[in-house]
Every structure is written in structure tokens, then in C-alpha cells.
Regions:
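C-terminal, low-complexity/hydrophilic appendages and adjacent surface loops
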Residues: 23, 71-163
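Substrate-binding rim/cap in mid-to-C-terminal beta-strand-loop elements of soluble/periplasmic
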Residues: 1-44, 48-63, 80, 147-150, ...
């Protein structure tokens, strides 16, 4: 993700590769850190600096390294039927011109070393909130052995949804998703 074009990298690891998780949200903090501006970045800015990985690409030695990557994606579903597998939903090509109040489902995903899990939840597009008790579908893909570097078919590891075969893993990853994305319950 980050390449220093100078012939000898000041960080000591020219061309090094890391297995650390990185998200787009980390880019701003990383660039600010590399520019020496990290102390100027407000605490309200999300993300973590990936600059320490340039010094030591071994993410297991970095206490701030992420254990997972998270994402969310709205889908514009036409005539979705509850309890059908995700692959038989009729999905529109693009949400670009879809009115906000027509977005009925939000997919929340977590990617760990061994798994990618997505939960498709009913979405209240007016309140901008997912209904965490209304799970429409789940997807779980085993990425054991996927180092992210081996050239393979685009979706070699995402051909078989194994969610029904791994209920304990689904519960664990769902709890992590909810902890990351779900808002705290309102206090009275």
C-alpha cells in the first residue's frame, strides 16, 4: 500500500510486505504521520497510522495493528424476499440514482486472517440506522491459506458460503461487527 520511491528507504524495509490489515480510513493518519503532522491531527479523526509498519512490517510486533478490517455497503434490492440466500436476490446494477429512502438493506462485513463475514441487515434509510435484530442473510467465507499475495482466481476463497456450517464463528464475528458498527443504546 505504501511505497517509498527513494533508492534506500529511510525506514529500513524497502519493498517489504506486511500481512497487517489496512483500511482506507487509515490513509489520512498515515500520511499525516509520515509528514510529521500526526500531533496536529484532531482526535476526532478516525483511523490509525500505518507508518510503524514501514519500520517493522511484522504486524504481530505492533500493538496498534488491527485484528480485522471492517466495511459496510448498501445494496439496492428490487423485490427482496426474506430467507432467500443472498445469491438469488435481484440486485440492481447501481445505487447511484436510488433515492435514500429506497435503500432497504445494509451489508456489514468483517475480514479477519481466516474469515470474511457479511451480515445483511434491514436498513432504516430515514433514521440512517440498521436493525441489528433483523438479519436478512449472512455470508461466511473461509480464507484460511489466503495470503493475499498468491495469484489466483478473483474469488477462489469466496465461492462457498459456509455460514450454516459454522454457527459459532458466525456468532463471534457478528458480535465483533455489532461492537464496531452498532450505536450504543440510548440512555434515559
Amino acid at each position: 500500500m505504501i511505497r517509498d520511491p527513494r533508492p534506500s528507504a529511510p525506514y529500513g524495509h524497502s519493498g517489504a510486505v506486511t500481512a497487517a490489515f489496512a483500511e482506507n480510513i487509515d490513509i489520512y493518519r498515515t500520511l499525516a504521520d509520515l509528514a510529521g503532522l500526526n500531533t496536529e491531527v484532531e482526535s476526532s479523526v478516525d483511523g490509525v497510522s500505518l507508518a510503524p509498519l514501514l519500520v517493522n512490517p511484522d504486524h504481530t510486533q505492533n500493538p496498534k495493528a488491527k485484528h480485522a478490517a471492517f466495511s459496510q455497503q448498501a445494496h439496492c434490492l428490487m423485490d427482496p424476499h426474506t430467507n432467500l440466500p443472498i445469491d438469488v436476490w435481484t440486485v440492481a446494477d447501481s445505487c447511484t440514482m436510488t433515492p435514500r429512502n429506497s435503500l432497504g438493506f445494509m451489508g456489514y462485513s468483517i475480514r479477519t486472517d481466516d474469515w470474511r463475514f457479511t451480515a445483511w441487515l434491514q436498513w432504516d434509510a430515514i433514521a440512517l440506522r440498521a436493525n441489528w435484530s433483523a438479519i436478512n442473510a449472512t455470508e461466511l467465507y473461509n480464507h484460511t491459506g489466503d495470503d493475499g499475495l498468491t495469484i489466483s482466481a478473483l474469488d477462489d476463497y469466496e465461492n462457498d458460503n459456509v455460514a450454516q456450517l459454522n454457527p459459532d464463528i458466525v456468532r463471534s464475528l457478528m458480535a465483533q461487527l455489532r461492537g464496531h458498527f452498532a450505536p450504543a443504546e440510548p440512555r434515559e
